[in-house]
């Protein structure tokens, strides 16, 4: 009897609960019925549209059969609209990596239909470098604009190979349209110094280096590249901003596919592969000032298909100097090595049949009507000089977060005294640098320091110091930027030393005299890269 009462009480209490559940189920059933009715209505509309489309298509086909279209012209309706081509519907898919996107470097994105790229999700591939989602370094050091100006064609060819390998790795067909990559930089800088030939402290604020790079990978084998750079040098006459102009810094076409062959070809306006000129400093090393040569060569090269191994380049171009034969050539040889991902580096050497076309030989920066201004100067120079051979030896090694750079470059024969002189004799200019660097984290940001020593010999006429002690601190406070501060101590040639160079016909340049003094310069720079 007692249990019957308990059961009766539970039944009375649970009846409202079941009633509520029944009401919820009825509401859910009604909502699903409304959705089903809406879907059925949509299906009926689509079937009606499909029937109308088939009827219209049959009518057009009958008209076309009765009255064929004229050759070489599309059939049209009475209204003049072109008849649509037959088509079919296909599934559109996007390949996604199995791993989390943060764990891989490349993840190109495209819409695929019938195993063909219909379109890239971002439209035609115009991307900011590095190519297609390659995760860049925090300081922007791996952007195209920061690739070494020497052998930039080889570096882009390697990048192009990594790009197309990424497509194959994730299962995408090779794009049938050019992939255009944009890169660039702006580097405003401020300097404070006390020059050799002045007792007053001087200072300047300038835009510094600014450049826009465009690399177009047409396919796996061919790439075109142009770099447009800002000319920061002040004009000879008028306000300094009057020379705020852009010019073609580099432009070339590279043909090669390292997956198929170690051979490649490059032609255009580039820095010839002579020297390395690697430095972490704000100021260019004296080796670069002396011998880096920009011209319009053809280059035939060899690059090991592995990341390490030998490389070679043979090149030729027409010289700017006019005495003797116009042709100049050279060779660059080297080897890239790496051991257990801890030690890596490069050793190499080069030879060029004339160093007179180098930027530091063509323009020394002297004022108009004063000392030797370079062979290319209209008022203080002359291109009618003998071609003088030069050589280069360089090495770079990195271990963990430390790196060491060594380089020597110089003429292997003397210039004629009337072309370039030192103490009344034909000059044989040389330059060398040694630089030690270390990377670390500062304030939770990537940073580096570097110290170096540089020297020159018989380069007084080129306005280069005899010795240089230099140090720099770099830090990336914000992504894709590098903030730098540099101290430089230059020592001039002695008081008893003098030099000169070729002058226009009938004129003589003022001699460049050593001062025996030293100069100190502090530079601050903000580099912004994309």
From Swiss-Prot:
- Where is the sequence biased in composition, kind Low complexity? 63-79
**Is the keyword Ribosomal protein in the record?**
no
Coiled coil ranges:
20-66
- Region annotation Disordered: where it falls in the sequence: 50-81
User: Is Signal there in the keyword field?
Assistant: yes
Sorted UniProt keywords: Coiled coil, Signal
- The record's disulfide annotation reads none
The leader peptide range reads 1-19
What's this protein's family per the entry? Answer: Belongs to the UPF0422 family.
- Listed name of the protein: UPF0422 protein lpp3030
Instruction: Give the source species.
Output: Legionella pneumophila (strain Paris)
